[in-house]
Amino acid sequence: MEKLLYNNKLYVCHEYLLEKDFESAVIEQAPHIFGENSIYIDIKKQIGESIITIPDGYLIDFSLEVEPRLHIIENELSSHDPYKHIGSQLLKFAISYKASGRKIKEFLLDALMKDESMRERVEAGFLRAGYRNIDAFLESLIFEKPLNAVVVIDQSSPELENVLGQLTLNTDIVEFKTFKYRNDYIHQFTPFNAEVRDVIEKGRILKPETLNTVVVPAREEGFEKEFLGNNRWYAIRISASM
């Protein structure tokens, strides 16, 4: 079992027994997990849990100012079978997504109309992105842009990565762990779109076209001089939605 030492207190890894408890923690920490430039919409809160082709939530992401995206969110426990449960759920969402587009738009619009603060944030975002109104914005997100998914899970695994890698759906995994000391909790995670947020936090404005190219030496001489000679090896993280 993993442990975390903080301020001379030993925190032990907290095991979530119920998915709803894990999901509540994710929703509470959503601004930190997904970023201040994103809006997490808890669809279950809006319509209940009776419709199986509705994900746990939707994320309207303005990390890329001129290219906002919509992501479906699935909050899962590692105890769930990656093939029969997680993979099949995402496959259902992918298959039904376009056919359910009008209903999804209705859900999102209804949720935004009920929350003034959320609506104002979305409006400011789509105006910056060049959309004339919320209707045109949602039409573009749902019907014109590719579908992306984010699986938030307490413990990732090679099996899960393999399953998600077989889907045509662009999918990211966010591992969200909780450590507990008495009644005190600490959450550990790598933020979604971390590579984008690192640049934003440095005060630079991002454009999608500047993030889709990795430059490497094309000739053997350049490879030997820069990569080997100067030891210029860099680990880069690129989310599936990029």
Segments from the language model and where they lie:
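Charged, terminal alpha-helix-loop-beta segments
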Residues: M1-M242
